[in-house]
Amino acid sequence: MKSCCVTDVGQKRMMNQDFVYASEEPVGNLPNLFVVADGMGGHRAGDFASRYTVEIIQKSIRANRERNPIKIIRMAIETANMKVLEKANSDENLAGMGTTVVVATVVENYIYVANVGDSRLYLIRDEIQQITRDHSLVEEMVRMGEINREQARNHPDKNIITRAVGVRSRVSIDFFDMKLEKDDTVLMCSDGLSNMLEDEEIQEIIR
């Protein structure tokens, strides 16, 4: 397995509120760990939320003696949610902050994934497939048949998310797992990438 990380502020913002962590080496009882977080809540607060969330997730996993990868990741995200919310409630400069997060680990030939918000994990095999499901207003509108995918890409509310870490006392997390095959490529990203490029464009670049 080989991994690499790239993050860029882009052309629309002065500060990059994304934070990424990647370790091909063991982290606690996980054989590897990959995390992408995209903060929100103003420049300082959003940057802090994503960085702090990734930091807490790492610390929680290192201290956890559990063996089940899904349980390990769940507890780490729940701990991060509690810690971020505490910070937001105790510092007026951080009030209202939160972050998306997508977490993955590969155990033998299986990948275990968790996500909150609209940061994504893709599997690129013969075709590109979005594994995670966005927790966003436009995704709900698509599922309800109110708009189609093309309308969702250009919708004025496309950046409104319905779940985030550090916003409420309890966080709802989606989990996925699947068997990987030789030459599979896994891509984790924030909406900074998925809002700019169609899935097929991403696939062409990765290839």
Region roles according to the model:
Residues 1-207:
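PP2C/PPM-type serine/threonine phosphatase catalytic domain
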